[in-house]
From Swiss-Prot:
Cofactor: how and how many bound: Binds 2 Mg(2+) ion per subunit.
Catalyses which reaction(s): Endonucleolytic cleavage at a junction such as a reciprocal single-stranded crossover between two homologous DNA duplexes (Holliday junction)
Cellular component terms (Gene Ontology): cytoplasm; Holliday junction resolvase complex
Subunit structure: Homodimer which binds Holliday junction (HJ) DNA. The HJ becomes 2-fold symmetrical on binding to RuvC with unstacked arms; it has a different conformation from HJ DNA in complex with RuvA. In the full resolvosome a probable DNA-RuvA(4)-RuvB(12)-RuvC(2) complex forms which resolves the HJ.
Protein name, per record: Crossover junction endodeoxyribonuclease RuvC
EC number: 3.1.21.10
Gene that encodes the chain: ruvC
InterPro entries: RNaseH-like_sf, RNaseH_sf, X-over_junc_endoDNase_RuvC
PANTHER family for this protein: CROSSOVER JUNCTION ENDODEOXYRIBONUCLEASE RUVC
Active site residues according to the UniProt entry: D7, E67, D140
Stated family: Belongs to the RuvC family.
Record GO biological process: DNA recombination; DNA repair
Length: 163
């Protein structure tokens, strides 16, 4: 099963692609979709949609895992990220890719065993779990990998529970 993990954002959208075979995870790719600050909102949202469709076409994920939004102090940022997240969910739905959503707490818990883990701890743990040569960066890409990993672990639980 190929899992596309996504860390929603407005200027930077992290993505991570993992293949899960049995209990093993294999890294396929990870990175960041960037949008230009010079572009107006509709152009930035279109850019997210186009780049995400390219990823879907390239990797053909079976399922997707998207990080849920959490509390933002800056309302304008929260609205922008919410708009970008809407484009992401719509794109995945149009491509008939099942969408699973996880809170930051669930993701941290699945990767490190501690729901309040710091970003550095998550990155170091991912490096070990995925047998990477270097720590995954930037944060957005690492968060997306963690989201995909979380889904892979929860997916096993879903299967064992008969879902």
């Amino acid at each position: 099963m190929v899992i596309l993990g996504i860390d929603p954002g407005y200027g930077r959208i992290g993505y991570g692609v993992l293949e899960k075979k049995g209990n093993m995870f294999n890294l396929i790719d990870y990175g960041v979709i960037y949008t230009s600050k010079e572009d107006e909102l509709p152009k930035r949202l279109l850019n997210i949609d186009e780049q995400l469709r390219n990823l879907i076409e390239t990797y053909k994920p079976d399922e997707s895992a998207v990080e849920k939004l959490y509390f933002f102090k800056n309302v304008a940022t929260a609205i922008q990220v919410g708009e970008a997240r809407g484009v992401i969910l719509l794109c995945l739905e149009k491509e008939n890719i099942p969408i699973y959503e996880y809170t930051p707490f669930q993701i941290k818990q699945a990767v490190t065993g501690y729901g309040r883990a710091e970003k550095g701890q998550i990155q170091r743990t991912l490096k070990l779990l995925l047998k990477l040569e270097k720590t995954p960066t930037p944060d957005d890409a690492a968060d997306a990998l963690a989201t995909a990993f979380c889904h892979g672990n929860f997916r096993r639980s879903f299967k064992n529970a008969g879902y």
